Amino acid sequence: MQIHNFSPGPARLDPSIISKSQEAIANYQKTGLSILEIGHRSKDFETLINALQENMINIFNIPSNYFTLLLQGGATYQNTFIANNFDKENKLLGCLVTGTWGRYSVEDFSKIRDTKIIEVSDNEIENYIQTPWDLEGVDYLHLTSNETINGVQLREFNKIEHDSLLIDMSSDIGSYSFEWDNLAYVYAGAQKNMGIPGVSICIGDEKYLNSEDNSRYLNLGQLVEKNSLLNTPPTFSIYVLKLVTDWMIAMGGINHFEEKSIRQSSRIYEQLESYGDFVIIPVSDYSKSRSNIIFKFKNEDLEKKFLIEATEKGILGLNGHRSQGGIRISLYNSITDEMVDYLSEYIDLSLIHISEPTRPLEI
């Protein structure tokens, strides 16, 4: 049975990336060494990391005055990292909270530096973008562009009237284009759209580099100066990230993945909305995530049945987050149209079967 993996992360990888990774584990670039053995200060790895940085500049259209970093610790580490940088003693950090991960961030930030919390429900995001709330005194504004647990996405951050945004893009980076004009710093764990766990992509404006007296792995200036090699980096995760960026460029870059994201998410949302008698989509239209579609059945028993039968059909990763329940469909960059076809057919058959129990549930 073919598996269709819609996991929220670690997420599906394109088969070509898995195949190339397997080859590199056996023998990297005909060196006789496994990629797992390559020294992080070797010429081979230097070539790899430089090529990766060029790929990221290409994909994200990164300006020349921005740095790129590859760090460990995931997006959660970034809560501590950000709080200890960006002039923590003198600058107020504002936090736009639209869901669970943004709330976790502000809880961590507030233990380290002065923080202003701005709570915005999914129903208020559109109004907030059009008429920003009180940002008086806020020197940096942090937000999470896509809340994987809540199914809320804020893509129009370039319209926010603030010139120093800090953005957690862990679950939607690479799925739509954006401008850098008002972005101070962007970060993303790789394991959803860009690879596997272990490495985080960090991109920032060089004018925010500081000389704060932080310990080494909290010292933004030192990390940039050492080009992500202050200590031993997650070499294999970086290698897979390089493969993903190669693949993204070959597929057509950001424009390709943005078009695909719009097409696939629109199809599933429209389908679910046609079954309003059975399911609830708890997010307002403007804020609906293209990356993580959240919905619940009105009947809890039918929801359990839907998940069990999906697994039997080879459709995996649909369970909502343990804190929310429900269903979560994750449509990251690696999800193919064929996978969405299969899922869509299952949704139709499953929900028709609810109203016509004698009808066979076969795809």
Task: Annotate each language-model stretch with its function.
Residues 1-39:
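N-terminal "arm"/small-domain region of PLP-dependent enzymes with the aminotransferase-like
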Residues 352-363:
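Single conserved hydrophobic/aromatic residue that forms the stacking wall/gate
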